Amino acid sequence: EILHNIPPTPQQEEFIEKLMQFAQSGDATILGRAPLSETEDKAKMLIATDYARKMALDMRLIDPNYDDHTDNKASHCARMIAEYYRKYDAQKGTQFVFSDLGTFQPGQWNVYSEIKRKLVEDYGIPSSEIRFIQECKNEKARKAVIDAMNEGRVRVIFGSPSMLGTG
C-alpha cells in the first residue's frame, strides 16, 4: 500500500473554510444549499461529513460547476494509472482501481468517468482497455470483463470494494 499526500486545491481550501463555518453555525446557505430543516439541523455534522468526503475526492461531487484542477485527486490518479500502464505495457499489466465514492453512473458526472476521460484524452490509453465493473449487469458480463483482463485486453478496471472485491 502506498499513500500519497495530495494537498487541497484552492477551491477545496475555500470550501473547507465554508464547511467549518457551517459546522459551527448550521447555516446551510454558506454551502449554497437551502436552510436546514429541523431534522437536518439535528444531523448537521453528518451533512458536514458527507460534504467533506465528497470535497476531499473532487469538488464536482458537490457541484458540477466547480472547475477541474491539475492537482485534484482525479488528475493525480490518472497520471499514476498512466505511469503504471506504460511501465508494464510489455507485460500487459492490469490495474484495479477502487473507490466507493463517485462511482460510475450513466448519464451523470462521476469520478470514474472523469479519470477514464483523462486517461484517454491526456494519456492516449485506448478507451476499450478501461472498464467499470458497474457496467456488468450480470455474472456472465462480469466474467467476460475479468477474462478480458486476464488476457490483457482490458488493462484498467474501476469498481467499489463491494462490486469488485476487497482489494
List each language-model region with its residue ranges.
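Conserved helicase motor "Helicase C" RecA-like lobe of SF1/SF2 P-loop NTPases
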Residues: 101-134
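Conserved helicase ATPase core of P-loop NTP-dependent helicases/translocases
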Residues: 124-164
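Short catalytic/ligand-binding loop motif for oxyanion handling, primarily in non-cytosolic enzymes
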Residues: 60-61, 104-108, 165-167
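Inter-lobe connector of SF1/SF2 helicase motors
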Residues: 1-69, 73, 82-83
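Phosphate/oxyanion-binding active-site loops and adjacent basic polyanion-contact surfaces
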Residues: 66-78, 107-112
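Short, high-confidence coil segments that cap the C-terminus of an alpha-helix
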Residues: 90-92, 153-154
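Conserved RecA-like ASCE P-loop NTPase motor core of nucleic-acid helicases/translocases
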Residues: 92-102
